Each structure stands twice: as structure tokens, then as C-alpha cells.
Regions:
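Bacterial N-terminal signal peptides
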Residues: 10-20
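Outer-membrane beta-barrel biogenesis signature
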Residues: 23-44, 130-147
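Outer-membrane beta-barrel channels and translocator barrels
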Residues: 38, 50, 81-84, 96, ...
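Membrane-embedded beta-strand positions in outer-membrane beta-barrel channels/transporters
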Residues: 42, 69-75, 120-122, 180-182, ...
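Transmembrane beta-barrel strands of outer-membrane/channel proteins
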Residues: 43-49, 89-97, 151-159, 196-202, ...
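Surface-exposed strand-loop-strand hairpins of Gram-negative outer-membrane beta-barrel proteins
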Residues: 50-71, 108-109, 166-173
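Outer-membrane pore/translocation modules
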Residues: 97-216, 258
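Outer membrane beta-barrel transmembrane domains
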Residues: 208-258
Length: 258
């Protein structure tokens, strides 16, 4: 029963929050610091459909741009004990197909893209709380603990493995690394949990941006919080909010003030 509940929980998380890992913008992801048994493997898959208005640099003369994006995502997590703490390492990979449309110099245009997105890896360790336990010990601990606080830290690395062509403005990959150190705290009280996570994004340069340009971005600093209510193991609901600052881009040494 424990394994079944954990698998259901894992799949729910992937379906709800697997996709945002692949975005450059801030994601809102609840339960990223949840206590898991060590020595376990988790796998899940999900699908997301996205519609959005997008904006481009005015110099490109692209207006009223929209995108429709289909994403199929798979995720794997392995948990283990690390320096007497509970830890995990995970991998996310997605395949995407989408259509972008808008006005280029006042003329309607559209383009389609399909392929793999950037791979994302995450290593996380709980510094306080959430002891490294297996099987029955883990189940017994979770059954008796009603109030607890967990503090964790993590590093997310987005790899430049996605579909990318330097002669195209729209790509599924980013052609650069992104490093995201994280620090989070969770307070559980009965069926309620309150989470707070601070994170910053460090971008390497894209020296092969569209039309031979060089793209740079300042670090992006983010803060997010979530309130989670657990109805039963494997079924929960969450509400969250986030704030981000920074990430301004520079093209060929010229600040874009975005």
C-alpha cells in the first residue's frame, strides 16, 4: 500500500509540475521537498498543452505572436542516503511539438517545431528533518509524525541538449546551460503544509543565437510559497504564488532593458 500511494503521488506531481522545469521563466512547483523513502525509484509521465501570447524585441517587427505547444514529459527519481541525510537525484526529458503564428512586417506568418527539449537534472538533499529511512521504518515514521519542519537544498542543471538551429529564431532548446541553486523550508502540521523556496538562475551565454548574435542574461532571483492540503496519501491540492526579479538580457553587449 505504501508503494502504491507513493507511485500515485509521484505521477500526480509529474502531471501537474513536470513541464515547468523546462522553462526559462520561474516555475511554481509544490512538494519539491517532500520526504521520500531512501533506496527507491520513481518514474512518471505526463502531457501538457500550452497556449500563450508571446512578445519579441521590437527590432524584429513581429506582432500579435501566439504559440500552441504540446509537451510529453517523462521523469525519473532515485532516492538514497547521502552523508546520513535523505537525498535524491532526478532527470526530466520532454518531447515537444508546437505552432507559432503572428504578424511579420504586417504579414501573417506561422512556423512549426518538433523535437526534444533540454534535459534537466536535479540533485536535492534534506539538511534538517526528513531522516533517511526505508520501507517499514519510513511508513512508521510518517504515520506517527504530525508536526515537522524540513529544510532542504538543491541544484538544478538545464543541459543544452534540446532541438536547436542557430539560423532559427524559435527553438525548443536554449543552446546554453542554466544552473539553479535552491534553498527551501517546509512546515507540516497535520494535513496542512506551508512551503517557501528561494532560487536563483545563472545562465551561460548563447554564442550562437539567432542570426549570429550573442545572447546573455543577468541572474534571475525568485521566491515562491505554497500551501498544500493532503486529503489522503496520493491526493492533495495546492495553491501557490511566486515573485521573480532580474534576468535582463543583453544582445551583443547591448542591454535590452527587458
Amino acid at each position: 500500500m505504501l508503494l502504491k500511494n507513493l507511485c500515485v503521488w509521484c505521477l500526480c506531481v509529474f502531471l501537474i509540475v513536470g513541464l515547468p522545469f523546462l522553462c526559462l521563466a520561474q516555475e511554481l512547483e509544490p512538494r519539491r521537498w517532500s520526504h521520500l523513502p531512501t533506496g527507491a525509484n520513481f518514474a512518471g509521465a505526463g502531457y501538457a498543452y500550452t497556449e500563450a501570447d508571446i512578445s519579441f524585441d521590437p527590432v524584429l517587427r513581429i506582432e500579435d505572436a501566439e504559440k500552441e505547444l504540446h509537451t510529453w514529459v517523462a521523469r525519473y527519481i532515485r532516492t538514497f542516503k547521502f552523508f546520513e541525510k535523505s537525498a535524491r537525484i532526478g532527470l526530466i526529458q520532454a518531447y515537444q511539438r508546437g505552432r507559432w503564428k503572428g504578424l511579420v512586417d504586417g504579414v501573417p506568418k506561422s512556423v512549426r517545431r518538433g523535437g526534444m527539449s533540454d534535459s534537466v537534472m536535479r540533485f536535492a538533499i534534506n539538511l534538517y528533518g526528513a531522516p533517511p529511512l526505508k520501507g517499514k521504518e519510513f511508513a512508521a515514521y510518517r504515520a506517527k509524525v504530525d508536526v515537522e519542519t524540513i529544510v532542504g537544498t538543491a541544484l538544478v542543471v538545464q543541459l543544452p541538449t534540446g532541438e536547436y538551429k542557430d539560423g532559427k529564431l524559435i527553438n525548443l532548446g536554449t543552446n546554453r546551460y542554466t544552473f539553479r541553486p535552491q534553498l527551501g523550508v517546509v512546515h507540516n502540521r497535520g494535513k496542512w503544509s506551508m512551503e517557501l523556496t528561494g532560487e536563483f538562475y545563472i545562465y551561460t551565454d548563447n554564442n550562437d543565437f539567432f542570426d549570429g548574435n550573442k545572447l546573455e542574461n543577468d541572474p534571475l532571483y525568485t521566491l515562491q510559497t505554497h500551501f498544500v492540503y493532503t486529503f489522503r496519501p496520493g491526493l492533495w491540492a495546492a495553491a501557490g504564488a511566486g515573485y521573480g526579479y532580474g534576468g535582463e538580457s543583453t544582445m551583443n553587449g547591448e542591454e535590452k532593458n527587458d
